Amino acid sequence: MHSTVRPPVALPPNFSSTEFRDALGMFATGVTIVTARNAEGVFIGLTANSFNSVSLTPPLVLWSLARSAGSMAAFSAGSHYAINILSADQQDLARQFAARGNDRFSGVQFVEGSGGAPLLQGAAATFECFNRSRYEEGDHVIFVGEVERCAHRTGASPLLFHGGKFYTEHAL
């Protein structure tokens, strides 16, 4: 019997970047704002939907950031950051932290977490994380955070993102 062994590499994609993005958009996600304080003491933050739990023991979460992001150096060098899961009524905040060239914290109410990262008022949940590890993959860096503190608002409805639009939850 004769078999053909394929080399252990991925085949090149048979789709465009746009097709890939459109397919990924079919996966509904929550919306987060990741915040930190840089080495100069300036607050930084950005909107991200690339958030996931990793482990319960120890408590680990992950999120990813484009290598080309202006805040990459600050998030890579910092010891702590916070992940704020947005509530259904915070879509304007999601847009504010996604926009470029503005003061993202203008008019935003928050308290500083124990590691110095802003915890946004009204968030459905917050995770205060130690910057445990980073992994470079493709055009992004995956950040793994060890959760030191977390909180959630009982009964809060999360902000959802699907197909390029914001939604709120509705039970089936």
Where do the language-model regions lie?
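Basic, polyanion-binding surface patches
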Residues: M1-L172
